[in-house]
Amino acid sequence: MGRVLQKKKNRSSAPKQKPKRSGQLKSGKKKINVLGNAIIAENWDRKLTLTQNYCRLGLVHRLNAPSGGSEKRVTKDGSIEEVPEDSLHIKGSATASAKQAAMGETRVERDPETGKIIRVIHDDDEIVVGGRKLKKSNPLNDPLNDLSDDESAGIQSQPRSKSTSAIVQQLERQADQEGQAVKSKKPRHQSKREEEWITRLIERHGENYSAMARDRKLNPMQQSEGDLKRRIRKWKASHSA
């Protein structure tokens, strides 16, 4: 027979206490360590939000286009700072088509018998692909096409703050150093036990890799035929040198 207090607890509608999970927010989402990088942690301002810090450092915290507008900050002289539009943001098809649509005249070629439209004749700079009006220079409607054109025209020479430029350059140098370290990583050498195991396999089966893969005694871990080929090729290269 259970205790009366325990029965009351079971019938109570009060939420039961759950053990606190480390690295998890109250909303249940995983807590992200934004200060994992030493350069970002050194230049992080705890008085600002994550978005404000990323904008100040010259980084982007979200690749999607903003859905609710952008924050307008007041400068020292009292004017409102205008945030430039990011050319890498991919806009929705409805918004893009509404902005690109313009009033104009076109010529239509019809079938003399049925009266159906055969061909729509536009200006030289525009064509119709799949019922959509596209530029000849960008028939796939690639949003990065305009960016490449702007870069060739000198968009890379836009002025940026020295602190932002320095931080981004430090991060790029760090990423380049880590990439070089991965490339220059020393290859794994086979141990003596592995070389002895490969020698026994070759002595018994020769070049028959399928028989090696099926051998339960010499190949208890059931290494695949392709894996055995790579190991034996590496063993031969080390012994031929």
From Swiss-Prot:
UniProt keyword Nucleotide-binding, yes or no: no
Coiled-coil stretches noted in the UniProt entry, renumbered to this chain: none
Subcellular location: Nucleus, Nucleolus
GO cellular component terms, semicolon-separated: nucleolus; preribosome, large subunit precursor
Bias kind Basic residues: ranges: 230-241
Keyword field: Nucleus, Ribonucleoprotein, Ribosome biogenesis, rRNA processing
Low complexity bias locations: 137-146
Summary of subunit composition and partner proteins: Component of the pre-66S ribosomal particle.
Main function: Involved in the biogenesis of the 60S ribosomal subunit.
Membership in a protein family: Belongs to the NOP16 family.
Protein name: Nucleolar protein 16
Organism: Aspergillus clavatus (strain ATCC 1007 / CBS 513.65 / DSM 816 / NCTC 3887 / NRRL 1 / QM 1276 / 107)
UniProt gene name: nop16
